Design a protein with these regions (language model features):
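Post-Walker A alpha-helix
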Residues: 27-28
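Conserved glycine(s) of the Walker
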Residues: 22-23
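Glycine-rich, often acidic-flanked micro-motifs
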Residues: 3-5, 9-19, 33-160
Length: 160
């Protein structure tokens, strides 16, 4: 599971992650405002990630945070985006070495030592196959458009 808010649009899931207070729920609400009913927010705190038949999927879980958004849905994963507040909207793709510590910090990883190797192997696969971004943003519709268009384009280029 990843500490994130998960939204589906255009047949793919996109996850917004970061520490508490970074605007994960705010950003998925902006997606709803910007793209309307085409967006499905299916988990607002801890979606599950799983690789199945050569493809990564995001799942809604009962662990859904204060807003209670926890739909029992599965979507192909199109991208993960870490959020930072900023005065300008900018997005960039993160190399795996930069993305790994961010993902580890937001992963439910209180595991016995013998399972850490499995977690790290899964994260290695995830980072090789799924584009990860950093979005510096203001809470506005322009940031929602920037994040979606950038991640959608990357997902299409990667064949996701």
């Amino acid at each position: 599971m990843l500490h994130a808010s998960a939204a589906a649009l255009g047949g793919r899931a996109y996850l917004f992650s970061g520490p508490c207070g970074r605007g994960k729920s705010t950003h998925t609400h902006l997606w709803q405002q910007t793209f309307g009913e085409a967006v499905q927010v299916f988990n607002d705190d801890k979606p599950a990630l799983r690789r199945l038949d050569g493809r990564w999927y995001a799942y809604g879980t009962p662990w859904c945070g204060k807003d209670g958004i926890n739909l029992n849905q599965k979507w192909p994963l199109g991208g993960i985006c870490f959020l930072e507040k900023s005065q300008e909207n900018r997005i960039r793709r993160l190399p795996a070495a930069e993305a790994l510590p961010l993902i580890l910090a937001q992963t439910t990883y209180r595991l016995p030592p013998q399972y850490m190797e499995l977690l790290l192997a899964s994260l290695d696969s995830l980072l090789r196959e799924i584009p990860v971004f950093l979005l510096e943003n203001r809470p506005e519709e322009a940031a929602a458009r920037l994040s979606f268009e950038t991640m959608r384009r990357a997902a299409e280029e990667e064949g996701l």
